Amino acid sequence: MSVEYFQRRQHILIEKLAKENLDGMIVTNLTHIRYLCGFTGSSATLLITVDQVHFITDGRYVVQSEKEVKGAKVLIDSIPHYEVIQKQNLLTSSQSIGFDGNNVSHQGYQQLSKVLSDINLKNITGIIEKMAMSKDKKELEAIRTAVEITDTAFAEVLPMVKIGVEEKVIANQLSFLYRKYGDSDSDAFAAIVGTGPNSAKPHHKPTDRKIGPGELLVIDSGAKFAGYHADMTRSFATKGYSDEQKSIYDIVLNAQVKSIEGIKSRMSCKSIDSIARDYIANAGYSKFFDHGLGHSLGLEIHQDPRFSKVSEDVLEENYVMTVEPGIYVPDIGGVRIEDDIIVTKNGAEILNKTSKEFQVIS
């Protein structure tokens, strides 16, 4: 990414800060720092003002910051980052500076207000998250690539998914393939692989439990490329499955298809969630669908906006969302089907190519 690419983002943030009567912002969330200047390390603070953007880190990241940081003056020091701001006189008395309260602990705020005691501090939670909701061309390209890697890995893993194979073997193979086809940091999140009773646990951690006959199997996983995430879920039945297990699969698939058909720019997230929720409720499984329909993707696996029954968000073009209804019935098993989509003016573009047809494993 070019210097100009990140400077555009910084300029947009400065304009938004000005509307809040703020002279700048202290950014401590590492994902937000990456979004604003490109740094991928694990310790940094970004100070953005109208006059200058300063990137603060320590001696471990001299080479990395020289290579990665765009549109900011790099300051290397071993003392706490807030103290660097004071030491370098980067702010003047009575300036009003924003910070994100979701990413500053109580102790951190006490330290910040003590070190910068003559600065007016204001919590402006969510300002960068809202900027990041709509994806630009480069971001969409990265997400498309992450989804393609996910599809490729699933295609290679599926032939080894058989009765008698352990959950963790499948999860480990997916992780290996993401690194084979992607970059060095290629797992979007720890894969969820649940079979039998474990399939009814939405966030199950893979174990040495083996796939058995007459069961449901859920595989939820995704690759990451250039920092951007993919997230896909497919569900399967094994030989000897019951009529109810097949029925649950069909209900979830239909709920997902109908939800995606309802998506377009300016639709409320709550209304899209209700399409799937109402369909599943009418099929008699209301109490077994107990999570939101989906969430946004980007430099984090879970971002706003979200499809949920309490969401107040409205969809805009180039939002990237997951659509993932599920039914989880103890003693019967669970089904979740998930795709990543791009919101368009008149609909949704489904990125995943992996089949959603009912498949039986033997």
Sequence positions of predicted segments:
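Active-site neighborhoods and metal-handling regions in enzymes and metal-associated proteins
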Residues: M1-S362
